[in-house]
A protein has these predicted regions:
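GH16 jelly-roll
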Residues: 2-256
Length: 256
C-alpha cells in the first residue's frame, strides 16, 4: 500500500496542534504499527479507537432489508501508516465498517466514545472508485432523535461519484437538508474539514470552503462515526472490491 506523500500544510490544513479559536482534543496518524484484518484496534490503537458496530450489524440499508452490514473483523486493518477499509462481498453480503475515535467527553447514559457540542473535524482520506459503496463520515446526535436534532456529514457520497458535505437541519422532516458538492473524486488524497459552531456549519476541502449553512443548525451534543457502508440506493456488484484509506484524523473543541 502506498504511503501518501507529505508536504508542508497551509494553516487551514494543519492537523496537529491548536488553532486560533480551537483546542485540539484528538490526533491520530496510525504510526504505532500494523494491525491485520480481524484484529483492529489491537493493543496499539485500542486506547484511542473503537471498531464500532459488531460484525453482522445491519448498516443503514441493511436495516431496510438489503444484504449489507458492518463487519469490522473482515474489513478494518492498519498498514503502512493508514487505517484501511477492505470493502467487499462475502456470501452475498456487502461489508463495511464504522470505527469511532475515542477521547474523554461528558456523555453519560449512555456513554459515548466521543462527544462534543460544537467542534472542528479534519480527515485526510481517499478511496477506490467503488459503485454501490459509500462514505458517510458523520456527526450523529447523542439523543438519537433524528431528524429532530439534525446530522452533519462530510465526506459523504457513493465512492464512484463525488464527495459532498451535508447538513440535516433540526426539523421533523427527513428531507430538510442541504448538500455542498466538491466536484472532486474520492480517488485522490483530500483533506475534508467540518467546522461546527453555534448557528453555523462550514465545510472545507483541501483548505477551501465549499459552503456554509446557518439555518436550524444542530445545537445538541453529537458523536463522530466514520460510517462506511453500501446499498444506498443500489448494492455493489458481488465482484466489486477495493479500499478506503484514512491517513490522519484530527479533532478540536472550541477554545474557551
Amino acid at each position: 500500500m502506498e504511503r501518501p506523500k507529505q508536504s508542508t500544510p497551509s494553516p487551514s490544513l494543519k492537523a496537529s496542534g491548536d488553532l486560533p479559536g480551537w483546542k485540539q482534543v484528538f490526533w491520530e496518524d496510525f504510526d504505532r504499527g500494523d494491525v491485520p484484518v480481524g484484529e483492529f484496534p489491537g493493543d496499539a490503537y485500542r486506547p484511542k479507537w473503537s471498531a464500532g458496530y459488531k460484525d453482522g450489524t445491519p448498516d443503514t440499508a441493511g436495516q431496510k432489508g438489503k444484504h449489507s452490514g458492518y463487519y469490522p473483523g473482515k474489513v478494518l486493518s492498519v498498514k503502512d501508516g493508514v487505517l484501511d477499509w477492505y470493502l467487499h462481498t462475502e456470501d452475498g453480503v456487502s461489508m463495511g465498517a464504522a470505527p469511532r475515535p475515542k477521547f474523554p467527553n461528558k456523555a453519560e447514559n449512555p456513554r459515548r466514545d466521543n462527544s462534543m457540542l460544537y467542534g472542528r473535524y479534519s480527515v485526510r482520506f481517499k478511496a477506490d472508485s467503488l459503485r454501490g459503496y459509500k462514505m458517510a463520515w458523520l456527526l450523529w446526535p447523542n439523543s438519537n432523535k433524528w431528524p429532530r436534532d439534525g446530522e452533519i456529514d462530510f465526506p459523504e457520497g457513493d465512492l464512484s461519484e463525488s464527495p459532498h458535505g451535508a447538513v440535516h437541519f433540526r426539523s421533523d422532516d427527513p428531507a430538510d437538508f442541504k448538500m455542498f458538492n466538491t466536484n472532486k473524486t474520492f480517488t485522490r488524497w483530500h483533506v475534508a474539514t467540518t467546522e461546527w459552531s453555534p448557528g453555523k456549519v462550514e465545510f472545507f476541502l483541501d483548505g477551501r470552503s465549499i459552503g456554509v449553512a446557518t439555518k436550524n443548525i444542530p445545537k445538541t451534543p453529537m458523536h463522530l462515526i466514520l460510517q462506511t457502508e453500501s446499498c444506498l440506493p443500489k448494492c455493489p456488484n458481488s465482484t466489486t472490491e477495493g479500499h478506503v484509506q484514512l491517513d490522519w484524523i484530527a479533532v478540536w473543541t472550541r477554545a474557551e
